[in-house]
Amino acid sequence: MLFWRGENFSLERLPADRSRVIYPPEPLAGIEDPEGAIRNALLNPMDADPLPTLLKPGMKLTICFDDASLSLPKMRRPDTRQRIIEAVLEMAAEAGVDDVHLIAALGLHRRMHDYELKHVLGDRIFDAFHPRGTLYQHDAEDYDNLTVIGETEEGEVLEINKRVAESDLVVYANVNQVAMDGGWKSITTGVAS
């Protein structure tokens, strides 16, 4: 049987009498106009106000995005995260938002290499944000960049990335369709301690 493993495939033998193959459903049809679909989602989100109405001059905007830790095949460029972030940045610029940071939501995963960040974000975004220090990777063990936001009923301290806590708006670019990924838990695992 052929398995996806890391960046490659491996061929493995499985015992026929103790193995069962479960096939996934057919893939979803591709989106013909990804940029249009992204823009439509930002202008017409489910159960939320359109992004442009939330953007105000002088605000702190933080855009978090998935790291490269999941063993999924690399996307062709442009990566969907790049497309999402470009659309958000365009709307932010139109609204006069200048204080924008990009954070790779690593949680406790390994740091991404610069070439991985460039693959995810594209050269233009990387070159615009990385040299200024406004593109960085969350470090759940860097306590100087964490802030306490409360504690659980059991007394466990809740810490989150300081920039995220201080932001007026946080946008998260998540692109995976796997059962254990995405949604609010991307924040609680990606940019918390």
Language model segments and positions:
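Amphipathic alpha-helical segments in well-structured domains
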Residues: 81-85, 118, 191
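A short, gly/pro- and small-residue-rich
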Residues: 183-193
